[in-house]
UniProtKB/Swiss-Prot annotation:
The lineage of its organism: Bacteria, Pseudomonadati, Campylobacterota, Epsilonproteobacteria, Campylobacterales. Na(+)/H(+) antiporter that extrudes sodium in exchange for external protons. It comes from Campylobacter jejuni subsp. doylei (strain ATCC BAA-1458 / RM4099 / 269.97). GO terms for biological process: regulation of pH. This is Na(+)/H(+) antiporter NhaA 2. Coiled coil: none annotated. Pfam families: Na_H_antiport_1 (PF06965).
Amino acid sequence: MQMIKKMALSETFPGILLIFFTFLALLCKNSSLSVIYTDFFHANFTVGFVHFQISKSLDLWINDGLIAIFFLCIGLELKYEILRGQLKNIRAVSLPIFGALGGMITPALIFAAINYSYDFAMKGWAIPTATDIAFAVGILMLLGNKIPTSLKLFLLSLAIFDDLGAIVIIALFYTDQLSALAIIICLFCIFALLLLNYYHITHLSLYVLVGVVLWIAMLKSGVHATLAGVIISLFIPLDTKNKKPYLHEVLKDLNPWVVYFILPLFAFANAGIDIRDMHLGSVFSPVSLGIILGLFLGKQLGVFIFCFIAIKLKLAKLPENIKYGKFYGICILTGIGFTMSLFIDGLAYKNSDIFEHADKLAILIASFLSAIVGFIYLKIVK
């Protein structure tokens, strides 16, 4: 029992859990359990009362609802690190920012270069721009003491800025037709959150209440509802009136739910791809190649080149006692897009099967390639 508890508390466990539920989803979708698996996640669930109801399939409740809590955690983490943590120093924060920029621009350009003549495929240009924090850090932790703390912090910081970039991309490019009334309600909710923050209110139930209303309003507005999580994170106070840490405590309470429940459930709901009738040629289709080359090559090259240029221009500094060889290994791991890439894929193609799920398979291939190559590279290079 003690051994199970120790394993569950280790930093590698979230990554292992994601891998397990990914393979479980693939097993379910490609076996006699396929119909049960599909029907379960497509089953409609209605929440509300007589005159106000929200009805969605289970997979959409996960993708639109639970993932908002994940984005809330990302927002809280970033806010804490910038105001109190490792990113307080501008020199420390500049390297992961440049890396995140390179890791978004380069994969997007590679995807666009391959798919520019296919209008529908081009909707997925942002798919290879994401990094999965839990998976990437989980792989890194498997290497133990071989990786210096400064490099672990760089990867975590870069992944946070990467996810922030993904949030901006979702807001700007994957927003449906807007509803003026719903947006007005969103603004009222934001004003309410501002008041709660201004008066240093630390009753979490009030933030939850306003947050739920904000999430519903955003759902109806046309702006993706998961952004509600980011907005809420901006207004949660750092400390209580007595100067006791508050934001960090909220993050500590939420984090286990995200890494042990929400992300594994998201992986299980979205990684189920039927590959039984898939032709090998579909993996070499333009959309698949764009995703694989963008994630596996574009991410590592983009992150490294942008960081290298920033260092040479003295805009950023390589962590102390770190050589470029080891640093490049971290850049390879940024190609693990997995859950974030699957999420953007769902927004871009609305879960269409026009590509026969070759797009999702490409995400898995690129993510596992980045994980395996990055792990072996970091194991070998000193």
